[in-house]
C-alpha cells in the first residue's frame, strides 16, 4: 500500500469486506463485531479487558440514576473532537440514540425501544435517558462489555443530513476515534487507516492515557493496514 513498514501495523482479517468503502456501522447488513470500524468508533463506555472494568469514553462518568433506576443522567466528556474539527457533545449522543429508536431498519432499534422511552439533551454536555422500567444495568447494556456495542456515537452534523442512514455508505467517515480511512481496496481485500494529525483530540488521546499508561512522547502507529 506504499507505506513504510516501520510505520505500519498489519492486521490480518478472516474474510474480505462485503461492501468495500462502507464505514457506516448502521448501514443495513453490517456485522458490528467484524472489527473494521473499531479504530474509528466512539462509545459511551469502553472496557478495560485486563482489569475487567468499564470506564467512561465519550461519557465523562458512569451515569447517575434516580432512586428507582428509571432515569439516567450522563455527563459527556469535554475536549473530544470529530476528525473534521467539530466538538463531540450531547447533540451527537442524543441524535445517535434517537436515530436508532426512530429507524426500525437499524438492527438495535427494537431492543432500544423496548427499554428506552426518551433521550433528551439537558445541556451541551449532559444527556438524560428516561427508561420504560427500572434499569440498573444501564452502562453494561449501552456500553462495551465484551466484543463491542450496537451503540456507536455518530456525528450529528453529518448523519442528520442523510435521507436514509441505513443506505448511507459513509465512504469518507468523520470519526472520533484515533484513525481515519486513508484508502481501501475496491475488491474488499484491505483497508488502510491513518493516525489523525490531531489524534490527541480523539477518544484515544483524551481518554487513553488514563487507562493505558502511555506518555506524551509515545505515539501510536502512523498506519494500520487491515488485510485479508
Identify what each model region corresponds to.
Residues 109-161, 178-185:
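Surface-exposed binding/hinge segments that line
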Amino acid at each position: 500500500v506504499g507505506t513504510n513498514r516501520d510505520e505500519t501495523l498489519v492486521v490480518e482479517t478472516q474474510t474480505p469486506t462485503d461492501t468495500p468503502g462502507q464505514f457506516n456501522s448502521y448501514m443495513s447488513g453490517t456485522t458490528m463485531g467484524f472489527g473494521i470500524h473499531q479504530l474509528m468508533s466512539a462509545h459511551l463506555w469502553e472496557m478495560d479487558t485486563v482489569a475487567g472494568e468499564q470506564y467512561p469514553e465519550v461519557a465523562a462518568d458512569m451515569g447517575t440514576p434516580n432512586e428507582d433506576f428509571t432515569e439516567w443522567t450522563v455527563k459527556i466528556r469535554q475536549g473530544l473532537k470529530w476528525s473534521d474539527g467539530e466538538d463531540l457533545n450531547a447533540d451527537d449522543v442524543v441524535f445517535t440514540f434517537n436515530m436508532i429508536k426512530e429507524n426500525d431498519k437499524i438492527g438495535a432499534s427494537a431492543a432500544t425501544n423496548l427499554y428506552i422511552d426518551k433521550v433528551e439533551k439537558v445541556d451541551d454536555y449532559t444527556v438524560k435517558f428516561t427508561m420504560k422500567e427500572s434499569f440498573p444495568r444501564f452502562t453494561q447494556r449501552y456500553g462495551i462489555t465484551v466484543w463491542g456495542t450496537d451503540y456507536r456515537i455518530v456525528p450529528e452534523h453529518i448523519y442528520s443530513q442523510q435521507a436514509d442512514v441505513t443506505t448511507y455508505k459513509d465512504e469518507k467517515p468523520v470519526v472520533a476515534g484515533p484513525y481515519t480511512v486513508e484508502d481501501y481496496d475496491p475488491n474488499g481485500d484491505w483497508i488502510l487507516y491513518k493516525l489523525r494529525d490531531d489524534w490527541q483530540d480523539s477518544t484515544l488521546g483524551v481518554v487513553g492515557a488514563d487507562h493505558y499508561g502511555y506518555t506524551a512522547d509515545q505515539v501510536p502507529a502512523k498506519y494500520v493496514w487491515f488485510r485479508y
